[in-house]
């Protein structure tokens, strides 16, 4: 049985473990599609995507169409004659004309247990909503938003200390085996498809910076989830006077408080205790504008005074 001719489409780091596995597999990785280089950083220099950097390092052809609205981009893909297209966080909509090019269709590695958390930010939403488990789903793509029939699922627990960053890394690594299993099943014509139950679908819309502000009138558990879900981006924040204070790490406590939500109850080497709508939140790692991430303990040792007991965080 011959290996499959694979075209890969993806942009961020999430797809790199699967790319590493693909190039070592018996399948033939013919080309990589990724988003165009974008300006980034203070100098606004054009930056290549992690997937493009990987492809160049491995001497794989790279294609970067703006979209697939023009026939030229569609024809270019068609000329590669792929058996299958593997799509992981590509970031471009694939029209029906593109989905129909590969002989075995396009398959997507999605970072949730579908049909829960269809959409752009499944990892963040799993943490925000306190899900006990997350995982990856390999599905056949159709024109809907993460609505296609499922080929394989793999689950993992979401721990109370998981951030979007740590869960992202776990799911990226655990995507490899289910993807390779699905490719083998497709190659041997033994793939099993399971339709999604649309009644169970939930949607994870795109996260934006405006959502990152902490509402101290929420519970300590809800605020803790938000801080973890928004780490490493966009990072949850509050206002300490007129200063934006980013909070990188905190945990809910069982200390009850009757003070106004947002009031700093205490600061010591264990952290900064802040009142919420129920129990206090212990803030452990912070970042002031233009400064590095620092533990509250180290901040106290620095002798600075912007934070103090009785301060109202907004």
UniProtKB/Swiss-Prot annotation:
Binding site for (6S)-5,6,7,8-tetrahydrofolate: 112-115
Entry EC no(s): 2.1.2.9
Domain of life: Bacteria
GO terms of molecular function: methionyl-tRNA formyltransferase activity
GO cellular component: cytosol
Catalytically driven reaction(s): L-methionyl-tRNA(fMet) + (6R)-10-formyltetrahydrofolate = N-formyl-L-methionyl-tRNA(fMet) + (6S)-5,6,7,8-tetrahydrofolate + H(+)
PANTHER family in alphabetical order: METHIONYL-TRNA FORMYLTRANSFERASE, METHIONYL-TRNA FORMYLTRANSFERASE, MITOCHONDRIAL
NCBIfam families: fmt
Protein name: Methionyl-tRNA formyltransferase
Organism: Legionella pneumophila (strain Lens)
